[in-house]
Amino acid sequence: MKIAVVGCGSMGCYFGAKLSKKNEVVYIDAFQKTVDSLNQNGITIKEGDKTESYLAPAFLAGKYNSSVDLVLLFVKSTQNIAALTQNEGLFNEHTIVISLQNGFGIERELSRFVAPENIILGNTAINCVKEDIGVVKLANGGVTILGSAVDNKKLALTGKVLLNQSGFETEVSDDIKRVIWENAFVNVTLNPLTALFKCKTKVCYENKNIWALVESIANETIEIAKLDGYSFDAEKVLDQIRNICINFGKGYTPMYQDVKNKRFTEIEKLNGQIVNLAYKYKKDAPNNEFVLNAIKAIERLY
């Protein structure tokens, strides 16, 4: 299969490198420095005591105009429209898009470029750390869950086979929107709070005052999810967040790293979308609105 990885950060490089063992993979990025480094040095993946190197043919966004079978989207979800518009040459009527991005409403954006039945959404427990351009260390392994945006299970199974063949533990969900909601509870709490308090993930549970904020945001988000047709048990949601803090809490969230490095975050696709849904259902979401405004305020100070 011919695959284009759009966005060559840690996750794009990791997934692309693994898939390149059995597929033809090209890498697309918006930064010339990244493109030059990948072409010259390839990709290095570190997993435990094992280090592997991969060739990485890379192109500047908009410069690769051959259609592909699959686009793997690893830019920030707030950059989807710009990235895909720049790279429209990748698409034909059969091209599949896989997005493992955080946030809501991604399928609506992708459907501007491919048919909804060609869109696979998902979530992954895999977490990688970028040590340098094209040098990636696996921090946490885990399951990747895929699902069709329009209940095209055959397509989701195709994605599962593709990833499984390259060593990814992959499952298919019949209700990917519920999976996205489950992932959202973690992202709308731990991401902004670690960024605001400049702390590791584990501190969100260890510090009782931050944990009180986690509970407030999570409970409010559960109420919005119910209005959207999805019911969740608050105790189970908080247990999920607590377990992540305890078991995977030594690292830093993506939003913390974005703020630290003065990059724009995905806050509008996370808490911002919760606020939008609340507005849609004529409900207030003051906790989500507070962290949305707080992170946006920090971004304006860069």
Across the structure, where does each feature detected by a protein language model lie?
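Rossmann-like NAD(P)(H) cofactor-binding subdomain of soluble oxidoreductases
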Residues: 50-135
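Internal alpha-helical scaffold of NAD(P)-dependent oxidoreductase catalytic cores
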Residues: 89-90, 113-118, 133-183, 188-189, ...
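NAD(P)-dependent Rossmann-like dehydrogenase/reductase catalytic/cofactor-binding core
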Residues: 164, 215-302
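Short, well-ordered alpha-helices that flank and scaffold nucleotide-derived cofactor binding pockets
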Residues: 17-21, 85-89, 112, 272, ...
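Short alpha-helical
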Residues: 32-33, 78-79, 104-105, 154, ...
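Nucleotide donor/acceptor-binding cores
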Residues: 1, 69, 142
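NAD(P)+-binding Rossmann beta1-loop-alpha1 motif at the extreme N-terminus of oxidoreductases
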Residues: 1-51
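Hydrophobic anchor at the start of a short beta-strand
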Residues: 3, 24-26, 116-119, 170
